[in-house]
Amino acid sequence: MQSSLPQFTFKWPKGPEAIILTGTFDDWKGTLPMVKDPSGAFEITLPVTFDSPSSKFYFKFIVDGQWLPSKDYKVNIDEGVENNFITEEDVIKQRENGSSTLVPESAGLAVSKNAPLIEPEAEKRAKKLRKFKIKRVIKTNKQTGERSIFSQEVVELPDSEDETQQVNKTGKNADGLSGTTTIIENNVGVNEEKAIKPYEENHPKVNLVKSEGYVTDGLGKTQSSESRLYELSAEDLEKEEEEEDEDKGGGKDTSTSADAEASEDQNKEPLSKSAKFEKPEEKVPVSSITSHAKETSVKPTGKVATETQTYETKQGAPTAAAKKIEAKKATRPSKPKGTKETPNKGVQKNPAKNGGFFKKLAQLLK
């Protein structure tokens, strides 16, 4: 089919940098660039068709971006616009002269229904994409946790290689901020704005409190209902621990309870208070020293009973001894039948003989 169509070669003398041929064959779109030969001249050969022997083939040249007609071809003026044209006779004359040589580049393009030849330039333009920066403000409802876009701003970035390299290296925007999303937390309406920062997301704040083996979370709630916040001194903590130990060991022998309470009071008081025991002039009445004996099913031993009587008869106790002293009577479980009852070896002896606090107390009472 290609050989049956008449061919015509369009030419332009050397001088320009680039020339494009356009006309009725491509609806004046400027899609067919001409080929530059070694001499610097431009030419292109393509098939032409005529509807009738009197019809004309209109065309024009685009020389370095300017639409110009050629003086080597016939010119038609239509409403002040000049265009070149050829007829079927011009094609026959050129073929008889033997100058109608088909250029390979133009033949393939003409057969492909005048495909656009400036596609590479269009691709270059497409590669230069416009860059935008989108800033969103997101509103978060604290009750439901639902997020919605409160506002959105689109800013076009300037075409700068330095800025592009900076974004690729640092991973930040042109304004130097590491994030463009703003979170608004509210209960009913908009209360506040705060920018999200990466280190806040990776390191949430956790408030630690001293509890019974548990740690509170960010909302101040503990994982156990038994845990509590201690705001006591070291002496109060020690006292609570000793009371818990006494509650746990309530079923054991209570013969040494009086000595434990007295030693606890002695450990708590500083040296300045213990020095008051040496002042005999500070005395209180006998009624200030009381004793409480807890009755049990088993009769107490005689030694403990004599101790309580001795405390009640003595006078002149110092102010520091005004505290209540609980003398728990020692108990002893019942022995099986057939055994002879013997004194309890675990019964505490007279504290005045052991020394310490009770020894000083006995000396002062004398």
UniProtKB/Swiss-Prot annotation:
Keywords of the record: Cell membrane, Isopeptide bond, Membrane, Phosphoprotein, Ubl conjugation
CC annotations in GO: cytoplasm; nucleotide-activated protein kinase complex; nucleus; plasma membrane
Phosphoserine, modified sites: S160, S288
Cleavable signal peptide: none
Cited InterPro entries: AMPK1_CBM, CRP1_MDG1_kinase, Ig-like_fold, Ig_E-set
Region (Disordered): 159-180, 217-366
Other comment: Present with 1240 molecules/cell in log phase SD medium.
Protein name: Signal transduction protein MDG1
Organism (species): Saccharomyces cerevisiae (strain ATCC 204508 / S288c)
